Amino acid sequence: MNLNRFKRYPLTFGPSPITPLKRLSEHLGGKVELYAKREDCNSGLAFGGNKTRKLEYLIPEALEQGCDTLVSIGGIQSNQTRQVAAVAAHLGMKCVLVQENWVNYSDAVYDRVGNIEMSRIMGADVRLDAAGFDIGIRPSWEKAMNDVVERGGKPFPIPAGCSEHPYGGLGFVGFAEEVREQEKQLGFKFDYIVVCSVTGSTQAGMVVGFAADGRSKNVIGIDASAKPEKTKAQILRIARHTAELVELGREITEDDVVLDTPFAYPEYGLPNEGTLEAIRLCGSLEGVLTDPVYEGKSMHGMIEMVRRGEFPEGSKVLYAHLGGAPALNAYSFLFRNG
């Protein structure tokens, strides 16, 4: 496998830390050892997160092409757009963000706090759009790029989750290589890796990266899209493409993609009671914050898998914490009593 042939622009501190979730493990019976790899604190750029790791492999292309404006898209409380705004500010580039109405959640301050507030503070041109949720290429995003061109600028397109970019999966191939180095220091290997999936490139990169040592099927994706067929198909497609890019040496098959689907509902961006319990439990036991859109759902999935005995006793499970806590501000009413 050859990741080093791709240019990488450093935006993170270095390897994100792996920390034990001792109190949560004990609370769940102590038969499974839980750890977290903290992508939520991987960078000094506006709280970082998984998209910052991905952007390290996209930004060299933007700079080589002489682009002056990063153009991206997401929901109103998109972590992606906040991280793109931060990177643009860091590089001295302009930033246009399309924020679509992906979540059927009504709150007076939903479009004024959290991620979108930070993007505005960082100088991004934030454009609200009424279109609903979808993980594909969006007309509103294409229009934003055309607007930049018409103004004489040179846009660099960054799709939702970085996922439709040809290099969108590379960052999390690097994640797997990083974990292998950290495992040498820890003195053990993780039996399972749990990760949230929506647009697909995070899990796709992990599938390829861990396929290098035979652990692709040990990457357990927790769907948060509530459109699992689309998400799984996109993970598989991106993983196959990424495997070719890094010269994995074998084909990625449908069996390599494991996606657990019950935890995404009632729909994208809306938490259920299990999501909220997981957020409170992880917060109160570990001081680790997760959000109602993504990490609260993947944390819920991991907790339920432990409770149901789906991990063999003695398993060491690595939770990939992808970030997202800034969105908690937009859901403050749900936590008004804690």
Curated annotation (Swiss-Prot):
Protein name per UniProt: 1-aminocyclopropane-1-carboxylate deaminase
S-S bonds: none
UniProt keyword annotations, A-Z: Hydrolase, Pyridoxal phosphate
Similarity section: Belongs to the ACC deaminase/D-cysteine desulfhydrase family.
EC annotation from Swiss-Prot or TrEMBL: 3.5.99.7
Stated role: Catalyzes a cyclopropane ring-opening reaction, the irreversible conversion of 1-aminocyclopropane-1-carboxylate (ACC) to ammonia and alpha-ketobutyrate. Allows growth on ACC as a nitrogen source.
CDD domains documented for this protein: ACCD
Gene3D superfamilies associated with the record: 3.40.50.1100
Residue positions of the active site: S78 (nucleophile)
Species, as recorded: Pseudomonas fluorescens
Alphabetized NCBIfam families for the sequence: ACC_deam
